[in-house]
Amino acid sequence: MIIDTTTTKVQAINSFSRLEFLKEVYETIWMLFPILILVLGITIGVLVIVWLEREISASIQQRIGPEYAGPLGILQALADGTKLLFKENLLPSRGDTYLFSIGPSIAVISILLGYLIIPFGSRLVLADLSIGVFLWIAVSSIAPIGLLMSGYGSNNKYSFLGGLRAAAQSISYEIPLTLCVLSISLLSNSSSTVDIVEAQSKYGFWGWNLWRQPIGFIVFIISSLAECERLPFDLPEAEEELVAGYQTEYSGIKFGLFYVASYLNLLISSLFVTVLYLGGWNLSIPYIFISEFFEINKIDGVFGTTIGIFITLAKTFLFLFIPITTRWTLPRLRMDQLLNLGWKFLLPISLGNLLLTTSSQLFSL
Amino acid sequence: MSEFAPICIYLVISLLVSLIPLGVPFPFSSNTSTYPEKLSAYECGFDPFGDARSRFDIRFYLVSILFIILDPEVTFFFPWAVPLNKIDPFGSWSMMAFLLILTIGFLYEWKRGASDRE
C-alpha cells in the first residue's frame, strides 16, 4: 500500500529536483499518514471494545447498560475518557514520582508497538517484517516492566503485590504463548504475519491453522487471556484481595492509560488469534462461488482492501465475545493454581505440541 | 533498513500518544494545595504503617529465574523453525537434542520443586 503510491509520487518529485535527501524526507512524511490512520483506528477499536464489553456484561447480568451518551450509549467510553483527562493528577507523597508517572506509558507503548505487524488486508500492513510475530513477542514482554515500575513507584503494599503478581503472571504465560506461535511459524515456514495468513488461504476455512493446531489454539487462548489479565486470571487487580493491584494509587488519565493498555492488549490478542489461527483477511468460504470470492481477495483496489479490513475486523470482534463472556462465567484462580497451570500444564502441553508439529513437518518433507 | 523505518516512526508516535495524556492534566494537578492524607498510601482508611518496599515472597524471584532460563532457549528455536524445510536432517535433529536437554532441565526443576508454591 505504501510502496505503490510512494514510488509514483517520488518519481514526480524527482522530475522536479534530483536531491536525494528530499526523496527520503518525502518518504518519511508519507509514512506518517498510514501510521496516524492506524493509531486512529486503534483508538476507535478500543472505544468499540469498551462499549461491547459494557453492553454484553449488562445483558449477561440482565441490566440495560450505558444508554444516555449517544445512540445506544456508544459515546460512553469517550465521555469517561474525557472525564478522566480533566481529573486531578495525584502523586503519592512517599512514592517515586518518575517511576509512578512513566509506568502506565511503558505499558501502553509496548502494546501499541505490536500493531505494526498486523495485516488488515492482503498488502495492508505497516511493516511486513520477516521476523513479524517475533517482534510482537519481544515487544509485548516489556509491558510487565511498566506494571512492575508502577507497582514499585506507588509505595503502597497493595500496589507492590499487584505489580509483582502482574510480572510473575505475564512471564509465566509468555513461554507457552511463544511456543504456540513457534508451532505456527513451523507450519507456515515463515515468521512474517503476511506469509502466515497466505499459508491459510487455500481450502477456505478448512485451511485455517485452527484445524491443524487445535491444542496450540486452546493454549494460545488461555495464555493470551492471562497476558491480558482478563478475569479467570485477573489476579494482579483482584478486587477482593488487593484493592486494585498496581492501579490502587492512580487517578485521572494515568488510571485511564492502564485501562487503555488492557483493552489494547485484548484487541491485539484477538487480532493475533485471527491472523495466526483464523485465516486473517481471507473470506474463508470453501465451496460457494469459490472462484469469484478468491478473486476478490486478489483485487488491489479500494474494494478488495475494504473487504479485507472488514473480514479481519469481523473475525476479531466475533472472537472477542469469548474473552468478554468468560469474564462473567468463570471464577478467579488462586495464585498458586495460576502458576501451576502455567508451568505444569500449559508449558508441557505446548512443548508436546511443538514436538508433534516438528515431527509432522519433518516426515512430510 | 527501509523496512525498519516505519518502526522508528511508529515508536516516536506511540511515545507521543502515551506521553501527551500524561502532560494534559498538569494544569489541574494540585499537589501543593491538598492535605497530606490525600497523598498518603491507601490502606483501607488507616494511617499507612511501615514501608511498602519490604520483603516479598522468594517464589516470585524463582519464577523470574525460571523464565530467564526458558525464554532465551525458546527464542533460539525461531531461527531454526522458519527454514526447517531448507536445512538438512542434521540441523533439525541437533535442535531436537537441544529440546531434549531443555526438557530434561525442566523435568529436573519440576522434581526439585522449584515450581511448587506450597
Swiss-Prot record, chain A:
<feature type="transmembrane region" description="Helical">
    <location>
        <begin position="302"/>
        <end position="322"/>
    </location>
</feature>
<feature type="transmembrane region" description="Helical">
    <location>
        <begin position="32"/>
        <end position="52"/>
    </location>
</feature>
<keyword id="KW-0793">Thylakoid</keyword>
<keyword id="KW-0812">Transmembrane</keyword>
<keyword id="KW-0618">Plastoquinone</keyword>
<comment type="similarity">
    <text>Belongs to the complex I subunit 1 family.</text>
</comment>
<keyword id="KW-1133">Transmembrane helix</keyword>
<comment type="function">
    <text>NDH shuttles electrons from NAD(P)H:plastoquinone, via FMN and iron-sulfur (Fe-S) centers, to quinones in the photosynthetic chain and possibly in a chloroplast respiratory chain. The immediate electron acceptor for the enzyme in this species is believed to be plastoquinone. Couples the redox reaction to proton translocation, and thus conserves the redox energy in a proton gradient.</text>
</comment>
<keyword id="KW-0520">NAD</keyword>
<keyword id="KW-0874">Quinone</keyword>
<dbReference type="GO" id="GO:0019684">
    <property type="term" value="P:photosynthesis, light reaction"/>
</dbReference>
<dbReference type="GO" id="GO:0009535">
    <property type="term" value="C:chloroplast thylakoid membrane"/>
</dbReference>
<dbReference type="GO" id="GO:0016655">
    <property type="term" value="F:oxidoreductase activity, acting on NAD(P)H, quinone or similar compound as acceptor"/>
</dbReference>
<comment type="subunit">
    <text>NDH is composed of at least 16 different subunits, 5 of which are encoded in the nucleus.</text>
</comment>
<keyword id="KW-0521">NADP</keyword>
<dbReference type="Pfam" id="PF00146">
    <property type="entry name" value="NADHdh"/>
</dbReference>
<dbReference type="InterPro" id="IPR018086">
    <property type="entry name" value="NADH_UbQ_OxRdtase_su1_CS"/>
</dbReference>
<dbReference type="GO" id="GO:0003954">
    <property type="term" value="F:NADH dehydrogenase activity"/>
</dbReference>
<dbReference type="GO" id="GO:0048038">
    <property type="term" value="F:quinone binding"/>
</dbReference>
<keyword id="KW-0934">Plastid</keyword>
<feature type="transmembrane region" description="Helical">
    <location>
        <begin position="338"/>
        <end position="358"/>
    </location>
</feature>
<dbReference type="GO" id="GO:0009060">
    <property type="term" value="P:aerobic respiration"/>
</dbReference>
<feature type="transmembrane region" description="Helical">
    <location>
        <begin position="129"/>
        <end position="149"/>
    </location>
</feature>
<dbReference type="InterPro" id="IPR001694">
    <property type="entry name" value="NADH_UbQ_OxRdtase_su1/FPO"/>
</dbReference>
<protein>
    <recommendedName>
        <fullName>NAD(P)H-quinone oxidoreductase subunit 1, chloroplastic</fullName>
        <ecNumber>7.1.1.-</ecNumber>
    </recommendedName>
</protein>
<keyword id="KW-1278">Translocase</keyword>
<keyword id="KW-0472">Membrane</keyword>
<feature type="transmembrane region" description="Helical">
    <location>
        <begin position="98"/>
        <end position="118"/>
    </location>
</feature>
<feature type="transmembrane region" description="Helical">
    <location>
        <begin position="257"/>
        <end position="279"/>
    </location>
</feature>
<keyword id="KW-0150">Chloroplast</keyword>
